[in-house]
Amino acid sequence: MCAVLEPSMIRWLSEVDNIVVSSLPSDYIPSGPAGVKAESCEVELPGSFGVIDEEDSYIRLLSAFATLVCRMSGESDVAMYSKANRLLKLAVPPGVAFQQLRASVTEAVEGTLALPAVDFDELSALEREKKQLDYYPQYFKVGVVTAADKTKLDQFRYHKFELLLRQVTSSRFEMVYDSERFSPDRIGELGEQLVQFLTLVEAKDDADVYAISLVTSGASRVLPDPTTDLGWGQFRGAIHDIFQHHAETRPDRLCVVETGVGQVAARTFTYSAINCASNIVAHYLLARGIRRGDVVMIYSTRGVDLLVSVLGVLKSGAVFSVIDPAYPPARQNVYLGVAKPAGLIVIQAAGQLDEAVEAFIRDNLSLKARLPALALQTDGAILGGTLPDFHLDTLVPFASLKNTRTDVVVGPDSNPTLSFTSGSEGIPKGVLGRHFSLTYYFDWMAKRFGLSEDDKFTMLSGIAHDPIQRDMFTPIYLGAQLLVPQEDDIGTPGRLATWMATHGATVTHLTPAMGQVLTADATTPFPSLKRAFFVGDVLTKRDCARLQSLAENVAIVNMYGSTETQRAVSYFEVPSCSSNPSYLDNLKSIIPAGRGMHNVQLLIVNRHDRTKLCGIGEVGEIYVRAGGLSEGYRGLPEINKEKFIDNWFVDAGHWGGLDLSGDEPWRNYWLGVRDRLYRTGDLGRYLPNGDCECCGRADDQVKIRGFRIELGEIDTNISQYPLCRENITLLRKDQNGESTLISYLVPRSDQKALASFISAVPESIATESIAGSLIKYHKLINDIRGFLKKRLAGYAIPTLIMVMERLPLNPNGKIDKNKLQFPEPTELDRASEHFASETLGLSSFSPLEQEIRKIWLDLLPTRPAITSSDESFFDLGGTSILATRMAIVLRNRLNISLALSTIFRYPTVKELAKEISRVRGTISDDKSSNSGTTEYYADAKHVSEAELASKYESRLSLLPSGATSAPVYVFLTGVTGFLGCHILADLLNRSRKPYDITVYAHVRASDESSALQRIKSVCTAYGLWKNAYAPRIKVVLGNLAEKQFGLPKKAWHDLQEGIDVIIHNAALVHWVYPYSKLREANVLSTVNVLNLAAAGKAKYFTFVSSTSALDTKHYLELSNAAIESGGSGVPEDDDLMGGSLGLKGGYGQSKWAAEFIIKRAGERGLRGCILRPGYVTGSPSTGASNADDFLLRFLRGCVQLGKIPDIEGTVNMVPVDYVARLATAASFSSSGNTHMMVVNVNAKPRISFRDYLLALKEYGYQVTSVPYDEWSKALESSSDEENPLYPLLYLVLDDLPKKLRSPELDTTNAKFVLEEDFARTNIEPIIITSVSLEVVGSYISFLHKLGFLEEPAKGSRPLPNISLSDEQISLIAAVATARSSTAKP
C-alpha cells in the first residue's frame, strides 16, 4: 500500500513545501500545549442569501473568509482547510474584484479536489522525517467546510484548528472556535464583519475586496473619530519657564540627586542651584550670538550637567541635541554634519573630543559659542572650562546673572530639540521637536497615572536617545525629584535593582532592553516603584512579569510612539501585581500599544484605500494624529511631505471656525491649527475594545534592543564594501526567539582579492552547506565587520553575515525573503566545532582566552567563528542581557566577579582576559598556587604595621565611681542593615539606668534628614521602630573608607572626644568578591573606625565579625579535638593563626584580616570585643528576615524544584535578636576592660540542615528528599533566571555539603556577658537562642506573607500565624541589608 501512495505523497510534499500557514489574530495564549476548547455560535445572513444555491453560497463564504484572513494576517496568500478533506492554497492579490475572486476560488477548489486524497498527519510525519525536523509541520489552522462535514477542531493529531466555519444553509453559517485563543467579542465581531462584507459585495461585486469597509456599527463606537478637535491651541508654556517658576517659588526643593557608589560621593542639587547654573549658561550662549532656532550640540554623560546644559540652551531660545561619547568619531561627525550646530557644549565628565571630530568641526562648522569643559560643582558653582588664549573660565563673567531670566520668548511651534533617527541612505535624519509637545501631556499624565511633586524619577535612558527628554522633563514639570545613578549601578548585574530600592525610586522610564538590565540577576525587591513607563521597543509579558516579581507595586505602562511623535504616544496599562496578581495571565506574549493619550489618536488606515479606517483585527498602517507631533526632519522637506501629512479625513479649512484668539507673546511663534498625521510605517490592528496592537513594519525599518534601524542604511554601507556584489539585511528570530540582524551577501567572484579571504572547507562538511559557507568565508566576514565598525553604530552591525553564491529569487524576479531564514543551530554548531580546532591558530590563545572563547560560544546564539582574540563580544551578537549572563558564567567558571560595565569596557577576548588577570592580582592561573590564600595574611600584617596608631587608651569603666547612671554615647555603623537595626533597637530599648544611651548612627545619605528616614524605614520594615528613638539618634554622615570618614576636622574631633563605645557592624557582604574587592570596605574601613579610638576619650571597641573567618580545615580539626576531650569547640582565646592559610572566600578572608588587625590594636591598649556570629536569621516571633538571605532562598528554590537535598551536618543558625543582644551586652561588659576578648555566637543546639529543609514538608509543601548529587543535577538542568537559587548556582552546586561544615565554638564568654548584662540592667532576657522547627515555620510563614511562597497544602503542622503589617511588607524587601547569611557559604 505504501508503494501505491508514494507518488501521491511526493505530489503533496511538493504542495506543502514552504507553505505559509494562515491564521487569525487571537486574544489569548492557550494555557495548555495540547487540546482545544471548542465553542460555537451561528450567524444569520440577510434573507436574500436564502435563494442562492448551497454550492454558490459555500464559494461566497469561502471567498469572503479568505479575504478577511488576508486582511487580518497581512498576507496575500491563504492556506486553509476546505471541504472533502482538502488543503486550499489561494492568492488574494490587492485590487481583485469579488467576482474575480469567486472565480479563482471556484477554480482552486476544483483543483484541490482533483488531487489524490491524503492523510495530513501521515504527510506531516513524512515531511518531518524527510527534512529531519524537530517538529511536525502544520498546514492549516482555519477552514471552511460544508454542513455535511463533521470535522472537529481536534480532528487531526498534528493540526489543531483554531477556527472552522461550517456552512449550515445558504443563509446561515456556524463558527466553531477555540475559546482558549479567541474571546466571544472577537468572534462576534468577525461574524458581523463577514455579514457586512458579503452584504456589500452582493450589492457591488466588482468592488476591490481590500477596499470594502470592515468597520461595523459596533466597532465604530470604540474606534477613534479622525474628525474630532484635539486641543490645537492649548499651549501649556515652555518647559524651562515652568521649571523656572518652580525654582523661584520653591528654591530649596530638591531637584537632582546624583547617587554615590564606592568612593564616589552622592551629590544633591536644588531647583534654585540648577536654575542659577542654567541661567549662567544661557546668558553665555546669548552673549556669544546664539539665537532662537540655532542648534547647540551637547557632548555629554549621564548626570546633572546634562540637565543644566539642556535648560541653558532652552532658556537661550536655541535647540539642544546630544552626542554620546560612546559613538565612533566617524558617527559623531555624521551627527554634527546633519545638525550643523552654532554652539557646542562639552561636559567635562564626557572627556575630550576625538581629534577626528575636532578636525571636522574646524573644517565644516562655524561655531558661535563653545563651552569646552562644563562642570557643575557640588556647591552649585558652574564652570565652563577655558578656551585657547584665555585664562579665565568661560562662565565666570556671567556668574552675576545667575538670578536673571533671559526673557527669550518661545511658542508652541518653536524648536527645542533635535533628535536623530535612522536614515535610508546611510545618513541619520534629524527630528526637530516642538515646545508644544514637551509640556502639553503632563497634566493629563499626572492625573491619569497619579504622578506628583512627591515622586522620585530615574535617569536611565540612553543620553543620546530621545527618551532621555522624558526622564528629565517629567520631574521638572511636576516639581519632583530626579535620581541619577552611577554607571556601575547600571552596569553591574543586579545592582540597578538595589539602587532602585535604596533610593526609593517611584517612577521610571525604561526601554525593554533597560528593563531587562534592571531585572537580570536582580534579587533585591523595590516595592517603592509605582509606575514604569516603557518606550522604544516591543514590550513582552515576560519583561513585565520579571519586573513585577521585584516591584510588586509597580503598574507598567507600555507607550507607543516615535521620535517624530515626541510626547504624543499611546498607552496600555498593566496593573500592579499587588492589585491584580493574575492580570498578565490573560495577555498575549506581546503587550499591546493600547490607545492614544489625551488628544492623541492611533489611526490604523486601510493600506489599499486610505480614506477608510481598518476594522477590528484588520492589519493596516498606523498613523498618529495629535497636536503634539514634532515639526519634522531638519532640512528634508520632501520626506516631511511623505511622513507628516495633512489630515484627509477633514476638509481644508475645517478648523477655521475655532476661536483661538489671544494676546499672549507666545502666539507670535505659533503657526496656527495644523491637523496633521504622522505616518509611522508600523503595521497594527485594533483589538475588540479599540486598543491597538503592533504587528510589524510597512517598510524595512526595524527596532532591535530599543534602537530603530533602517535596514536600508545597513545595506547601503555593506554595498560599499569592495568585494560585495549583492546584499540584503533582514530581521530574523533565532532559536531562542530573539530578534537578530542577518545580512546575506553575494561576493564579487570576479575580483582576485577575494581569494585571500577564502579558507579550505574540510571534506566532512559540504562546501555548499551553511557550515561550509561560514568556514569558507570566515576571513571575509571578519573583514566586513571591521569595515562596518567604522561606519555604523555597534547595535546596527549584523549579528550574522551569511555569504552565499546567489540570493534566492521568487517568480517575479525579486529576492525571496521567505527562503532567507535563521540558520539551523546544528549548522552553526558544526562550524563552531571546526573553528575550535587548532588548525586555525587557536593555539595562540592563552588558556584563559580559550576559556573565555568557550564561554562566548556557549552564550551567543549564533555560535560565531571566534578565530582571533581581538573579536568583540558585541560585534558577534552579544547584547546587554547576554553580557549579564556572561558575568554570571564568568563568576561560576572562573570564580571572578566583574561589573557588567567591565565587559562593555573590555569587549574583546584579549582585553577581557587581561582585565581578569589584573583583577586577580597575584593569583596565578596555576590552581595549586597558594598566593590567593596568603594575600590576606600578608596584607593584614602590613596594614597593622602601617595604619594602626602606636597606642590606644584603655577604657576602665563606663560608670563614674559611685554613680548609678551615666550618659553613654555609642557610635554604631551598619545601622541600616538587618543586624544593625536590631542592635540599634536593643540599645535604645534599654532603660536610662545604668546607661543613658545616645546612638551616633553612621549612615550614607545626602543629608541628615534622609539618613534618619532610612533608619526609620529599615526599623519599621522589621517591626522595630518607636518614635521615642528619634531624639536619641544622632546621624553621622561620612565615608568609612576615607581617613577620618572624610569629615571636617571639628566634626572628627567632636566624635573622638564624645564617643564612649564603638560598635563596628558595617561590612560589604558578597558571595564571590575576592579579597581585593572587599579590602577597602571590610579591612581599611575597619582601620579607619579603629582610629576613632586612637585619640580623645578612651573607648570600648566592638567588632562584628563572622565565623567565616574560621572556615578552614584547621578549625574543623581543632573543634573535633576539643569536643572529644570534653570541651565545647574552638576556644575563644584562640590566636586566630589557624586561619592565616586556607580561607577560600574573599569575605571570610576580609573578616580574618580585620580580626587580626584588631587584635594587634588590642596589644597596643585597645579594649573591647570581637563578636563572631554565623548565620544570622530572622526574628522567631515575626519571622521577619533579610529577604535576600541565602537560607531563605534555599527554601524557596527547593519548593520551586520540588526536591530537597539530603545533607548531613548541622547549621549554626542564630536568631537576629539574640545576636543583637550579645553585641550590646559585650559592648558594656567588664571583661572588655582588660583585653580584646572574643565572643563566639554558637546555636545550642544547632539544627541539622536536613531538618531545616524537611520543615517544608512538615508545613505542607510538596517536596521530596533526594541525595545531594541527584538534587544538584536536577537543579542544574531545570534552573533558570526565575529560580531564587539562580544567582547562587555556583555556590550550591559546588560541593555544598562540604561548604556547610563549620566548627563548633566555645561560648563561655557569650554566657558570661549575657549573665552580667542581666545582672546589671535586669533587662528581659532573650529566650530563643537557636533555630528550631517552630522557628523555621515562622520563616516559611514570612516567605508566604511576602508572596515568595504559595499557600501550602495541609501538612502535619499549620503555618504559624505571624504578624506583619502592610507597611512592613511593602518596606521589608526594599531595605538594603549589609549583613546576612548570604555571606556564609
From Swiss-Prot:
Residues 843-920 form the Carrier domain. Keywords: Amino-acid biosynthesis, Lysine biosynthesis, NADP, Oxidoreductase, Phosphopantetheine, Phosphoprotein. It comes from the Eukaryota. It catalyses: (S)-2-amino-6-oxohexanoate + NADP(+) + H2O = L-2-aminoadipate + NADPH + 2 H(+); (S)-2-amino-6-oxohexanoate + NAD(+) + H2O = L-2-aminoadipate + NADH + 2 H(+); (S)-2-amino-6-oxohexanoate + AMP + diphosphate + NADP(+) = L-2-aminoadipate + ATP + NADPH + H(+). The modification O-(pantetheine 4'-phosphoryl)serine is found at residue 880. SUPFAM superfamilies: Acetyl-CoA synthetase-like, ACP-like, NAD(P)-binding Rossmann-fold domains. One of its GO terms (molecular function) is phosphopantetheine binding. Gene3D superfamilies: 3.30.300.30, ACP-like, N-terminal domain of ligase-like, NAD(P)-binding Rossmann-like Domain. Catalyzes the activation of alpha-aminoadipate by ATP-dependent adenylation and the reduction of activated alpha-aminoadipate by NADPH. The activated alpha-aminoadipate is bound to the phosphopantheinyl group of the enzyme itself before it is reduced to (S)-2-amino-6-oxohexanoate. Belongs to the ATP-dependent AMP-binding enzyme family. This is L-2-aminoadipate reductase large subunit. It comes from Eremothecium gossypii (strain ATCC 10895 / CBS 109.51 / FGSC 9923 / NRRL Y-1056). The lineage of its organism: Eukaryota, Fungi, Dikarya, Ascomycota, Saccharomycotina. The gene is LYS2.
